[in-house]
Amino acid sequence: MLRDSHAAYGLNYVALRYNQPLYGWIEQTYGLSRPEYVVLYSLGLMEGVTASDIAFSSGFPRNTLSRAVNRLVKARLVVRTADKADARAQRLFLGKRGRAILEETLPRFVAMEEALLAPLTLVERETLSMLMAKVALALFEGGEEAAGASAATEE
């Protein structure tokens, strides 16, 4: 049984070797927690989304991201505005300083990815990217319930 879990171990190991040094550096250099940086990164991908949107796409709990957003707004890294169509919704945008931090940090993330993928050929990188996208999309579309249900049925 343990031998069959090598893919999960590999994913976890690579994620740890990628996340730990990068988010540790982000915290030491900018004083931002991982959820706070995830908010900045998410807004770099698409501005005008809600904290709930980021929670759904990132997998972080809503209350964790709510605290992160509040701290980022207070630090003026993120701007929160009321949605014109839905007064209950708050749209999020990068502040000037938040955008600057994102632009300063992204090269390190890219360099780490390049280092991790260096042993792979271009074809292997493309294959890995397609497979990871397929897994991520399935989790995104099925949500946590689908991931938990499929794991429970295989035991």
Each model region followed by its residue ranges:
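Residues within helix-turn-helix
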Residues: 51-52, 63, 70, 90
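N-terminal leader segment of winged-helix/HTH proteins
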Residues: 1-30, 42, 77, 155
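Charged, amphipathic alpha-helical coiled-coil/dimerization segments
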Residues: 70-133, 137
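Short alpha-helical "packing" element that flanks the helix-turn-helix/winged-helix DNA-binding module
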Residues: 36-40
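Short, locally clustered residues in the helix-turn-helix/winged-helix DNA-binding domain
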Residues: 15, 41-45, 106, 133
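Short capping segments at the starts of secondary-structure elements
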Residues: 46-50
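Alpha-helical residues within the helix-turn-helix
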Residues: 28, 56, 73-74
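C-terminal regulatory/oligomerization modules of transcriptional regulators
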Residues: 1, 122-155
